[in-house]
Amino acid sequence: CELFLRNLCIPADRLIGRPGDGFRIAMETLDGGRLGIAAQAVGIADAAFDEARARLKERRQFGRALEHFQGLRWKAADMWAKVEAARQLTLHAARLRDGGERFRAEASAAKLVASEAAVWCASEAVQICGGSGYLQGAVAERLYRDAKITQIYEGTSEVQRMIIASGVLG
């Protein structure tokens, strides 16, 4: 949605940037915000992995720790891989920004991948923790709620896909 303000008088000391640059400035501000959300989502995903790993090590079934069950080991491997992929993509976008390079598509990709990883890892943590992970106040339950918002604010995952497509396809 575009907004046009015609014949609007703004005192010179109240302008941010030059006339006509407002939309660009707003979008660049969002790029930085998206990078922050990506970092937040990486932290949530990492915490969800830690919560699941602790549960896998402490909980026992059939005389052995859950960490020894192949299917649960695969879940842990997938969680770790998603966390690390999100972390590396976020760091890459941050390096571009710090170097003064364009990073719009990379920031959106980092936010998309990290927020999707956070929700997935938090969901897996709830599943691994079982009924106790679903209880209100449980760490896994809180992480799941915290993860979900990262898919929404600073632009939904669908918006991030549109930005990425514009960046890579034109």
Give the predicted meaning of each segment:
Residues 2-8, 12, 21, 27-170:
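Alpha-helical interface subdomain recognition
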Residues 18:
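Carboxylate- and glycine-rich phosphate/diphosphate-binding segment that chelates Mg2+/Mn2+
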